[in-house]
Amino acid sequence: MSLFANKTLMITGGTGSFGNAVLNRFLQTDIGEIRIFSRDEKKQDDMRHEFQAKMPEVAEKIKFYIGDVRDLASVKNAMHGVDYIFHAAALKQVPSCEFFPIEAVKTNVLGTENVLTAAIEAGVKNIVCLSTDKAAYPVNAMGTSKAMMEKVIVAKSRTVAPEKTKICCTRYGNVMCSRGSVIPLWVEQIKAGNPITITEPSMTRFIMSLEEAVDLVLFAFENGVSGDILVQKAPACTIETLAKAVTGLFAPAHEIKVIGIRHGEKMYETLLTNEECANAIDLGNFYRVPSDKRDLNYDKYFKEGDIERNVLTEFNSNNTDLLNVEQVKEKLLSLTYIRDELAAWKK
């Protein structure tokens, strides 16, 4: 954590699952201060009490700022003295954004513009923004707003020297057991004795843990070039496989009920499009997609010719490694939430 020694890190949307995971990872390191910026005072108060109870010796490193990324003044107020930012604030529920698309634009697009504008003015050195696989070939309002967020990030990266402020983006799939995700819903349905509800058995989704989400952001922080999009080579599984893995751990004979696809959902998700794969750089467990550095003076590019392109096809949840039930169970058992719920269930 030497890059963070005595530094101030700001997390927008910091009371969510990602912010909690970062606090658990960072608080006992040599980081100077972590600023939690969010609009929900109750969640901030809950987080304050939680970390004062479990990490009293370092809890004073957490500073809380109430504000909204939609409000530039509140963002600027929290930005003074910040070295680094993890931008996680977002509206991310697909069905909700279908009914309130302009709200998704206000938070995910205009809110990101506010964060980046304030950060550049304040001299923040490194910003990592969190996006989603739903931004690739988007069919819903949430994904479309995140795709526009990524365009804002790339455009902003062109306006500031990277040695002054580096801005890059991570894109990932479903984070298991994060707030609002399906696995905690299923666990509650099992505990209540109700059938677990799935949308479409053959639907596929990328899966990763919160720890892997933090790892991806840290990889982007250390290795990304301004304007980059970085993704992890995540595995995937069908919704049916995930449901059978969860019921297999808790109640093998539990009923699974198919309820149909919700508003705005896709049968499979894409982490990298064909067009992005043409320029992607393979970094082992990750792909790096550099931004297009050309300007609007196209005449010189017509004269110089096209650049060399990769032959990769799109990277999606159908053509990545598809895990079976036992492999998904193994991933689930690596999660503290699942282990704790199983222990309580078996009492």
Sequence positions of predicted segments:
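N-terminal Rossmann NAD(P)H-binding glycine-rich loop of SDR-like oxidoreductase domains
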Residues: 8-29
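Conserved Rossmann-fold NAD(P)-dependent oxidoreductase catalytic core, especially the SDR/UDP-sugar
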Residues: 87, 91-151, 155
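Conserved glycine-rich Rossmann-like NAD(P)H-binding loop of the short-chain dehydrogenase/reductase
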Residues: 30-43
